[in-house]
Amino acid sequence: MTQFLPPNLLALFAPRDPVPYLPPLDKLPHEKHHNQPYCGIAPYIREFEDPRDAPPPTRAETREERMERKRREKIERRQQDVENELKIWDPHNDQNAQGDAFKTLFVARVNYDTTESKLRREFEVYGPIKRIHIVYNKGSEGSGKPRGYAFIEYEHERDMHSAYKHADGKKIDGRRVLVDVERGRTVKGWRPRRLGGGLGGTRRGGADVNIRHSGRDDTSRYDERDRERERDRRERSREREKEPRERRRSRSRERRRKSRSREKEERKRTREKSKDKDKEKDKDNKDRDRKRRSRSRERKRERDRDREKKEERVEAEVPEADDAPQDDAQIGDLGIDGIELKQEPEEKSRERDRERDRDREKGEKDRDKDRDRDRDRRRSHRDRDREKDRDRDRDRRRDRDRDRERDKDHKRERDRGDRSEKREERVPDNGMVMEQAEETSQDMYLDQESMQSGDGYLSTENGYMMEPPME
């Protein structure tokens, strides 16, 4: 390719001049000449220091020991600082603490972007606020970073108590605040968090000493959340494990599942039909009971009407008997043999009572008979449905057993066919005999399949027997 380039470009591809040869400065090891041979050091041993007079070896500090020492020194230094600050700490003489301590509310975990006006808007719903003080880093109020907590002084103590009860956990600017009373000036022996006090125990030491949730938090709520998270994680892992299994399943299993779902749907349909029938029967029974009740009510009303009419008639007859002369009445009261006879109205009333009792007993007997008849009818229907379900389950079980037996027969036939093929490969002379045997076995297998498919089954597909749809 380069031979076609012009000379000015070919000059660019020309090789450089070779590097001039210079002899090496150092000699090779075999070329070096040693003026003096190697010699021993025995004459110089007396010049060395005696090992017994040597100082003991200094032990160096390992990395782990150094880290442990620094940690221990830091803890001791911090404890000393806390003791010094505790001596000078006095919340009652704090110039920043103003107002009534029993009306002041402490708000922690406040968002750094939350302003005083936002806090006033959120906490003014519980009552009028006298003063709000957001705590900033020392010497940077108004321009520096806030510490994340504030003090709110209410005009009334009841408003502070209301805010203490209801404002805890309220979300302000995307963060849930923690609300508490001011404890520095109200609780004796109280120490702030920076001096080793406070409500929380989240910074005592390691994971075995610390508690996870501090202050007024309801730990049971967090425990429930952890439990729910663990449950969700377990379910997700279970679903992840299921997915590859489902992918590995073959097409025949899917067909089997479809047929099973079809069977379930058919069973469900039959159950729904039987339920609908039961509902209709119950409705008919209810209507019958209602009609019977209405008939009994009408009968009762008619009886009451008849009784009232008879009583009116009797009342009309009684005064006529009173107007008759006493002698006639006395003669009427005595019989032929001088026996006293009862008056006619009393007999009528007694007859009427007897008839009424008889009718009542008869109505109750009829009612009992109707109830018994309905109960027997319901029982017979229920028993019939149960027997049908039992027969249906028995048929299904029998069909399943038949399927299993048929699958076993198919497997045996396949195994026999494989064995005959192997035998044929081994013994080529008997090839014709084996072919005939195989053909006869296949014909028998086909006949058996046709017979079995005609016996309550439609067809075979991938070794799975399909049931005909239920009528």
From Swiss-Prot:
Molecular function GO labels: mRNA binding; RNA binding; U1 snRNA binding
Major subcellular site: nucleus
Subcellular localization: Nucleus speckle; Nucleus, Nucleoplasm
Compositional bias of kind Basic and acidic residues: 60-78, 210-246, 262-288, 299-316, 339-428
A GO cellular component annotation in the UniProt record: U1 snRNP
Annotated Gene3D superfamilies: 3.30.70.330
Compositional bias per record (Acidic residues), positions renumbered to this chain: 317-326
PROSITE patterns assigned: RRM
Keywords: mRNA processing, Nucleus, Ribonucleoprotein, RNA-binding
GO biological process, one term: regulation of RNA splicing
Domain RRM: 103-184
Sequence segments annotated as region (Disordered): 48-78, 190-471
Domain of life: Eukaryota
Renumbered residue ranges of the record's region Required for interaction with U1 RNA: 92-205
Subunit structure: Component of the U1 snRNP. The U1 snRNP is composed of the U1 snRNA and the 7 core Sm proteins snrpb, snrpd1, snrpd2, snrpd3, snrpe, snrpf and snrpg that assemble in a heptameric protein ring on the Sm site of the small nuclear RNA to form the core snRNP, and at least three U1 snRNP-specific proteins snrnp70/U1-70K, snrpa/U1-A and snrpc/U1-C.
Domain comment in the entry: The RRM domain mediates interaction with U1 RNA.
Biological role: Component of the spliceosomal U1 snRNP, which is essential for recognition of the pre-mRNA 5' splice-site and the subsequent assembly of the spliceosome. snrnp70 binds to the loop I region of U1-snRNA.
Name this polypeptide is given: U1 small nuclear ribonucleoprotein 70 kDa
Provenance organism: Xenopus laevis (African clawed frog)
